[in-house]
């Protein structure tokens, strides 16, 4: 199965108060050109679709255009939220999008079920794990103490019923233990880093 993986689009980003939207439109066009050339079975967008939890209208329009173009190309699309994304913003019309094979996992809301695609070699299970934070998952794991992002991710992954005999892809936007955050991560993230 041919996959195209992208992440950290940060649509709507401003650099030194200058909008990068025109540059981002160019990048979206390049992504679409790659899709036209490579014809992937699925496009995986692994978080930080937007640069801010409350994106401006122009950023939302660019994502809308990208989704329309992806739907026209008939590839399956799987999107998860990242720490910069608002789950509420990404979840808008997600059930409607599924009719166009666009699957969006904006927030952890209980055990994750896979999305299964098939190719000439059989089925592939895709597990869409949105960005998880202790505050967003703690209520689902009352018997566990979840103190940090790593424990949140471990709890969520521990609930997945992954069949290791099957081809499996887990799409995530994790917080990496031991990593460092730059100023823009701390300032623009929906959750503190």
Annotate the PLM regions.
Residues 1-68, 72:
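N-terminal active-site segment of His-dependent metallophosphoesterases
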Residues 2, 41, 76, 123-125, ...:
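Residues at the starts of beta-strands that form the adenosine-phosphate
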Residues 85-193:
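His/Asp/Glu-rich metal-coordinating catalytic cores
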Residues 8, 12, 40-58, 74-88, ...:
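Active-site neighborhood of divalent metal-dependent phosphoester/pyrophosphate hydrolases
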Residues 2, 13, 25, 74, ...:
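Context-gated lysine
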Residues 14-16, 47-66, 81-101, 106, ...:
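Metal-dependent catalytic neighborhoods of phosphoester/phosphodiester hydrolases
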């Amino acid at each position: 199965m041919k996959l195209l993986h992208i992440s950290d689009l940060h649509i709507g980003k401003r650099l030194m108060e200058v909008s990068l939207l025109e540059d981002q439109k160019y990048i979206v066009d390049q992504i679409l050109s790659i899709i036209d050339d490579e014809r992937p079975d699925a496009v995986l967008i692994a978080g930080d679709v937007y640069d801010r939890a409350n994106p401006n209208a122009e950023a939302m329009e660019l994502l809308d255009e990208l989704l329309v173009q992806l739907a026209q190309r008939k590839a399956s699309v799987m999107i998860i939220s990242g720490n910069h994304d608002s789950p509420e913003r990404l979840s808008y019309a997600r059930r409607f999008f599924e009719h166009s094979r666009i699957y969006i996992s904006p927030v952890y809301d209980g055990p994750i079920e896979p999305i299964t695609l098939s190719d000439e070699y059989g089925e592939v299970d895709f597990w869409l794990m949105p960005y998880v934070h202790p505050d967003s998952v703690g209520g689902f794991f009352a018997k566990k103490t979840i103190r940090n992002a790593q424990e949140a991710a471990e709890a969520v992954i521990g609930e997945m019923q992954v069949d290791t005999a099957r081809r499996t892809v887990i799409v995530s936007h994790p917080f990496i233990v031991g990593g460092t955050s730059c100023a823009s991560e701390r300032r623009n993230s929906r959750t503190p880093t």
